[in-house]
UniProtKB/Swiss-Prot annotation:
Residues 265-272 are annotated as: G4 motif. Residues 173-181 are annotated as: G2 motif. Keywords: GTP-binding, Hydrolase, Lipoprotein, Magnesium, Metal-binding, Myristate, Nucleotide-binding, Palmitate, Transducer. The gene is gna-1. This is Guanine nucleotide-binding protein alpha-1 subunit. The lineage of its organism: Eukaryota, Fungi, Dikarya, Ascomycota, Pezizomycotina.
Length: 353
């Protein structure tokens, strides 16, 4: 009698082989799938990086998608002017030209969320006239004393185009639009052989308790810091310096037991605003041990060292880049460098280098 395998045994062996093959496929896929967590304090530029990934790696925004940004851009623009006008009241700064006073009422009459495909002409005219006023400009220069959207000046400078009846948001308009991130958003894109799953979590303090759900099997952390905010206070706690908050947060992430083996890439972001601010808002006023005056390179080195020196693990390397998240050309270059870093890290973890 032969000792061939029974049908049941053959089926069992086939099942085992299929399971083994599936596990191999899963391991291969896992090696090629990069789970990247975007972290950083509120308004550090995380959502802007995600928009850049869509522009660079997903063919950009369709006409319908651009249309959907209109109301956000209109609302951002009107709300920014309202914030300045309210700050003028609290700082007791008058309009230079009282003839534009009626435009102030136009702005205050607008709802928080502007709806519609076209910005009402009287609103566009009001913003254009007020932005030219020397009193408004004077208040704008003191924007570190209140909470003003980073994109305010950009939208004000472009108000004639934004208020035009045939307006269609361009890439910069979309990149600079601001909606507070709540919860967790995921974006998937492919660079070379790697599939990236990038998670953006809300940066405000109230959102941070939700991060824990993203911690498992994270390949890389991309941590963003708005270095231009060295002289500003938190939106949610106006007793805390934004840069100090970012340092505290980076310390807790960099040295967390969850991330001992996770590579960390640090984007020191908003370098354009930082460069503009240094000559008019001395960094030494907020960081007394800083001795570099308004020298841009010295200030960059100081901030970089403040963050990197928080790393308590000798074997852990922090990869750093100075960035302007709204500059698509620069972000394309930086993300290519990030991709190279991740490939090297992957090879190291697999024991291939």
């Amino acid at each position: 009698m032969g000792c061939g395998m029974s049908t049941e045994e053959k089926e069992g062996k086939a099942r085992n082989e299929e399971i083994e093959n599936q596990l191999k496929r899963d391991r291969m896929q896992q090696r090629n799938e990069i789970k990247m967590l975007l972290l950083g304090a509120g308004e550090s530029g995380k959502s802007t990086i995600l928009k850049q990934m869509k522009l660079i790696h997903e063919g950009g925004y369709s006409r319908d998608e651009r249309e959907s940004f209109k109301e956000i851009i209109f609302s951002n623009t009107v709300q920014s002017m309202r914030v300045i006008l309210e700050a003028m009241e609290s700082l007791e700064l008058p309009l230079a030209d009282q003839r534009v006073e009626y435009h102030v009422q136009t702005i205050f009459m607008q709802p928080a969320q502007i709806e519609g495909d076209v910005l009402p002409p009287e609103v566009g005219n009001a913003i254009e006239a007020l932005w030219r006023d020397a009193g408004v400009q004077s208040c704008f220069k003191r924007s570190r004393e209140y909470q003003l959207n980073d994109s305010a000046r950009y939208y004000f400078d472009n108000i004639a185009r934004i208020a035009a009846p045939d307006y269609m948001p361009n890439d910069q308009d979309v990149l600079r639009s601001r909606v507070k991130t709540t919860g967790i958003t995921e974006t998937t894109f492919i660079i070379g052989d790697l599939t990236y799953r990038m998670f953006d979590v809300g940066g405000q303090r109230s959102e941070r308790k939700k991060w824990i759900h993203c911690f498992e099997n994270v390949t890389t952390i991309l941590f963003l810091v708005a270095i231009s905010e060295y002289d500003q206070l938190l939106f949610e706690d106006e007793t805390v310096n934004r840069m100090q908050e970012a340092l505290t947060l980076f310390d807790s992430i960099c040295n967390s037991r969850w991330f001992i083996k996770t590579s960390i890439i640090l984007f020191l972001n908003k370098i354009d605003r930082f460069k503009e601010k240094l000559p008019v808002s001395p960094m030494k006023n907020y960081f007394p041990d800083y001795e570099g005056g308004d020298d841009y390179a010295a200030a960059c080195d100081y901030i970089l060292n403040r963050f990197v020196s928080l790393n308590q693990h000798e074997t852990k390397q922090i990869y750093t880049h100075f960035t302007c998240a709204t500059d698509t050309t620069q972000i394309r270059f930086v993300m290519a460098a990030v991709n190279d870093i991740i490939i090297q890290e992957n090879l190291r973890l697999c024991g291939l280098i």
